[in-house]
UniProtKB/Swiss-Prot annotation:
Its membrane topology: Single-pass type II membrane protein
Cysteine disulfide links: 135-365, 356-432, 471-488, 523-538, 563-578
Protein name according to UniProt: Polypeptide N-acetylgalactosaminyltransferase 10
Organism: Homo sapiens
Pfam families according to UniProt: Glycos_transf_2 (PF00535), Ricin_B_lectin (PF00652)
UniProt-annotated stretches for the region Flexible loop: 373-384
Length: 603
């Protein structure tokens, strides 16, 4: 080869190499080279970068789908590394070490969670990455729609609201966030007025809207959605923390199918010490019982994916945290404007999207923490009823299945739902399917856990101890209270059953206070072979709440391998090593169904 040609080839090779190796530096915001926020344990306010400012750590590898669509890794590896190095109060989602002085009721009174603790944790605190390990290697579409993030609030705590905003800014690719819209539902706390305006002026992507009167959560969300400019609307609550790479997995599913509503996995931020952890059972399908309480049920084997980090269908959303294509949201009519304050809206939007041509998914690789309040700290305006909202949803969407609700809540039957003609017309114009279709094709696994027609109970009435002649009694105990042994009121000839001594051994193989038609929502629960028997929220998942009533009259607890026993001297009811000859371990139900009991024991 001649020298001139050789030099030319070398020059071309150098140019090509330079093009390959040239860093792809995007206009990414600095993660948190921040000014101090004045809170212990962390750096402060997120600050918008100067134009053109970027980070070499944001460089991404690009992959390709078979149809030519580009995929890329959206993780901010440098930000993740910095988060891993953070130490201080609440960092890595660890519990704040509370003192007795910080546990006082005053700390919870205004917000329903401990605002003293919240104020001592950095607004930019780090969170544990509790996603499935497969999420680390997932790639999403390189070109994704942007989103308006709508955060409604009413008298929210300062640090909890700001931490919500900071977590979104810190853990979202800036080009995917069209705006963050804070919608103030007529708050009257001073820190949410000019101080909030001044603080949020630091962030060009954040704006604040304010209602002129108390509208409630539902209509406040609608106000935010009405001014949104993003391709997608993402709703969050005002006391959340977005976790690592939470946004691209949501937007990717909508980019592939605009009629998909997507929900992040909702983790729990403890209302006392702000520890961050998964919900019990983690990935589960959203459901409801026939009193319209939200429930979670296991993913059935038929729907389980080979990769547990893949999205999965869910019949019903939890409510406050989801993303939806903006145009699709309005094609569906948004929320029913006749729904008041809050409650029932998650059912309305869930039924609507499934029955009217869309779908809904939970996204395991998108996680957002949420503070579940100890109690609701504000009053619902006079005349507003959650029951009315539920009746309205039932009348518009549930067809003949509404009757199952009215059977359990007879007070709903004659309650006015207001004028639903417009909503029924919307349903007709969208050519929506029937609720029977929804129950048959989408929520087909729900009746296994919450059947419309309650199967017969195995036993009910008083539970009398053979050895002592005394009865199990709740003593009007609150959740978590131990069951007690007391004199049997039926034996004293009282005219009516004492509600504290009436129990039902249900078809779920749990034992609940109340007669078969009116059972309560808490169950006999035991955690070990020596523990007291306590009343705990019924979860319908067996486990600690599974009981067997055997032919020898013992109440056997399979998880602990022990039997329910009692002590007459101190009125305790507790678990003990099974001894069929012990009369204090033998119990008599007032009424039994031998067919059901035989089935239980056979299983």
């Amino acid at each position: 080869m001649r020298r001139k040609e050789k030099r030319l080839l070398q020059a071309v090779a150098l140019v090509l190499a330079a093009l390959v190796l040239l860093p792809n530096v995007g206009l990414w915001a600095l993660y948190r080279e921040r000014q101090p926020d004045g809170t212990p344990g962390g750096s402060g306010a997120a600050v918008a970068p100067a134009a053109g400012q970027g980070s070499h750590s944001r460089q991404k590898k690009t992959f390709f789908l078979g149809d030519g669509q580009k995929l890329k890794d959206w993780h901010d590896k440098e930000a993740i590394r910095r988060d891993a190095q953070r130490v201080g109060n609440g960092e890595q989602g660890r519990p704040y070490p509370m003192t007795d002085a910080e546990r006082v009721d005053q700390a919870y009174r205004e917000n329903g969670f401990n605002i003293y603790v919240s104020d001592k944790i950095s607004l930019n605190r780090s969170l544990p990455d509790i996603r499935h390990p497969n999420c680390n290697s997932k790639r999403y579409l390189e070109t994704l729609p942007n989103t308006s993030i709508i955060i409604p609030f009413h008298n929210e705590g300062w640090s909890s609201l700001l931490r919500t905003v900071h977590s979104v800014l810190n853990r979202s690719p800036p080009e995917l966030v069209a705006e963050i819209v804070l919608v103030d539902d007529f708050s009257d706390r001073e820190h949410l007025k000019k101080p909030l305006e001044d603080y949020m002026a630091l962030f060009p992507s954040v704006r604040i809207l304010r209602t002129k009167k108390r509208e409630g959560l539902i209509r406040t969300r609608m106000l935010g959605a009405s001014v949104a400019t993003g391709d997608v609307i993402t709703f969050l609550d005002s006391h959340c923390e977005a976790n690592v790479n939470w946004l691209p997995p949501l937007l990717d599913r909508i980019a592939r199918n605009r009629k998909t509503i997507v929900c992040p996995m909702i983790d729990v931020i403890d209302h006392d010490d702000f520890r961050y952890e998964t919900q019990a059972g983690d990935a589960m399908r959203g459901a409801f019982d026939w009193e319209m309480y939200y429930k979670r049920i296991p993913i059935p084997p038929e729907l389980q994916k080979a990769d547990p980090s893949d999205p999965f269908e869910s019949p019903v959303m939890a409510g406050g945290l989801f993303a939806v294509d903006r145009k699709w949201f309005w094609e569906l009519g948004g929320y029913d404007p006749g729904l008041e304050i809050w409650g029932g809206e998650q059912y309305e939007i869930s039924f609507k999207v499934w029955m009217c041509g869309g779908r809904m998914e939970d996204i395991p690789c998108s996680r957002v923490g949420h503070i579940y309040r100890k109690y609701v700290p504000y009053k619902v305006p006079a005349g507003v009823s959650l029951a009315r909202n539920l009746k309205r949803v039932a009348e518009v969407w549930m067809d003949e299945y509404a009757e199952y609700i009215y059977q359990r809540r007879p007070e709903y039957r004659h309650l006015s739902a207001g004028d639903v003609a417009v909503q029924k017309k919307l349903r007709s114009s969208l050519n929506c399917k029937s609720f029977k279709w929804f129950m048959t094709k989408i929520a087909w696994d729900l009746p296994k856990f919450y059947p419309p027609v309650e199967p017969p109970a195995a036993a009910w009435g008083e539970i009398r101890n053979v050895g002592t002649g005394l009865c199990a009694d709740t003593k009007h105990g609150a959740l978590g209270s131990p069951l007690r042994l007391e004199g049997c009121v039926r034996g004293r000839g009282e005219a009516a059953w004492n509600n504290m001594q009436v129990f039902t051994f249900t078809w779920r193989e749990d034992i609940r206070p109340g007669d078969p038609q009116h059972t309560k929502k808490f169950c006999f629960d035991a955690i070990s072979h020596t523990s007291p028997v306590t009343l705990y929220d019924c979860h319908s998942m067996k486990g600690n709440q599974l009981w067997k009533y055997r032919k020898d009259k013992t109440l056997y607890h399979p998880v602990s391998g022990s039997c329910m026993d009692c002590s007459e001297s101190d009125h305790r009811i507790f678990m003990n090593t099974c001894n069929p000859s012990s009369l204090t371990q033998q119990w008599l139900f007032e009424h039994t169904n031998s067919t059901v009991l035989e089935k239980f024991n056979r299983n």
